[in-house]
Structures are given as structure tokens and as C-alpha cells.
Design a protein with these regions (language model features):
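Acidic, glycine-rich active-site loops and adjacent beta-strand->loop/helix elements
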Residues: 7, 72-77, 108-114, 138
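A glycine- and small-aliphatic-rich helix-loop capping segment at beta-alpha/alpha-beta transitions
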Residues: 14-19, 84-95, 100-102, 120-125, ...
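A short helix-loop
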Residues: 3, 11, 22, 125-126, ...
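Short glycine-rich, Thr/Ser-proximal phosphate-binding strand/loop in the N-terminal lobe
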Residues: 4-43, 150-153
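Short beta-strand-loop/turn "lid" adjacent to the catalytic site in phosphate-handling enzymes
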Residues: 54-94
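Conserved phosphate-binding catalytic cores of ATP/NTP-utilizing and phosphoryl-transfer enzymes
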Residues: 102-130
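Short, well-ordered amphipathic alpha-helical segments that serve as non-catalytic structural scaffolds
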Residues: 23-25, 44-60
Length: 221
């Protein structure tokens, strides 16, 4: 179970890693808005989770063989990382585990992103490795070492995230938030192109991305 800022997610996976059920539903954001307050996002998760969980457990073969429940509890696996939205999924996860008499395991939203890709790739057993996490609130390069327990930021953005740039530009174009998928479709259909952005400068593994938003805004004007 994962309850992030913009999406309610519930999945069922067997011991081999096969996905038996996968439900992802975006939270509702008003036209022209660039996101949700934590309180509104939490409320929507509480409303959407019961139906998603019911669908996940509707198959008797799945429901009668659940061995554990896992859920995200915070954005990153570092001390002090916290967002109220994750308490929605954590609360439901603990309740389900107690009702079924099975153990539960906590993880961070960022670890979920990384492991969801890593597990099904050729990097499954590679250690250590550097992962790149680009999302609506994160643009980071992370050094991951399972044996030493290292999960360290070694690069990324000093200001806003790539996802924020895409969403802000997309909303300016009149697209619904979040805008990434719609912008991808526009890019695929585009005929020709012209360069409107200056190259991004990197300093010791870090970049600043707010200038991209400014340049895109001027281009739209």
C-alpha cells in the first residue's frame, strides 16, 4: 500500500515477484491547481483505499494466502522524513495485518520507487549502485549499498524537482495535474522542434532547475 501526494496505490505480489493485482488511482485535483494540501490528499486516500483494498482481496485465492502486509510510512528512509499522507496507508495496513493475523513491514516511498524497478531489472543483484529518482517532488542521485546499509544522496537538484517543472508548465498549457503523461503524448505527436532552453550547468553533481521553468514560461508568452 502506498499513499503518496498524488496517487493511491494497492498491489498484491507473490513470493516470486509476480504481480497478481495492481491498482493505481490519481487523486482529484481541481483544474488549474498545481497539487493538493496534505489534509485534502489524506482525506481522498481515506475515501479511495477501502474500494481498492476490497478489489485486491476479492479473489479468495489471494485473500486466503496473504502472508504479510507492507506499506509506505514516509517519503525517504532518513530521520525526520515525514508527510501526513502516508499515515492513511499505514493506518489501513496495520489494521489489515491485525485482522488477518499476519506481520507487516514498513518502507519509504522512495525505497518503493527504487525496488519496483530494481527487482525486475538486470540490476536486481548489483550492489552497490547509483539510482536516479525523478518525480513530482524529487530529483536525486542516490548511492545505495545494501550490505553497508547506505542510502545516501550524492547528487540532484538544489531547488525544484523535474516533476515540478513539468507540472507547472503543463498547468500553464491548460493540462490537468499531474501533467507528465499528457506532456509525453504531446511530445510523441509533435512535428519538428526548436531549442528554447539553455544547457543546464552541473556543479559537483547538483543542478538548479528553476531556470527551466522560467525559460518555458517566457516561451509560452
Amino acid at each position: 500500500i502506498d499513499t503518496s501526494n498524488y496517487k493511491t496505490s494497492v498491489a498484491v505480489v507473490d513470493c516470486s515477484g509476480k504481480v497478481l493485482f495492481n491498482h493505481q488511482e490519481y487523486l482529484d485535483v481541481k483544474k488549474g491547481e498545481r497539487g493538493l494540501r496534505q489534509s485534502e490528499a489524506f482525506f481522498q486516500h481515506v475515501q479511495k483505499l477501502p474500494d481498492a483494498i476490497q478489489k485486491a482481496l476479492s479473489d479468495f485465492a489471494i485473500r486466503d494466502n496473504i502472508g504479510a502486509i507492507s506499506f509506505s510510512t514516509r517519503p525517504r528512509p532518513i530521520e525526520g522524513s515525514y508527510m501526513p499522507v502516508f499515515t492513511a496507508g499505514a493506518g489501513y495496513g496495520k489494521a489489515i495485518a491485525a485482522a488477518m493475523g499476519v506481520p507487516y513491514y514498513e518502507f519509504s516511498h522512495q525505497e518503493g520507487h527504487i525496488e519496483a524497478i530494481r527487482f525486475y531489472s538486470s540490476l536486481k543483484h548489483v550492489n552497490p549502485l547509483i539510482c536516479f529518482h525523478f518525480s513530482g517532488g524529487t530529483t536525486e542521485a542516490l548511492l545505495v549499498d545494501d550490505e553497508k546499509g547506505i542510502f545516501e544522496i550524492v547528487g540532484g537538484s538544489k531547488d525544484i524537482a523535474y516533476g515540478q517543472v513539468l507540472d507547472r508548465v503543463g498547468v500553464s498549457l491548460g493540462l490537468d495535474f499531474p501533467c507528465g503523461e499528457a506532456l509525453d503524448q504531446m511530445a510523441v505527436r509533435a512535428i519538428g522542434h526548436r531549442d528554447i532552453l539553455t544547457p543546464i550547468k552541473t556543479r559537483e553533481g547538483y543542478v538548479n532547475l528553476s531556470g527551466i521553468e522560467t525559460q518555458c514560461g517566457k516561451a509560452l508568452e
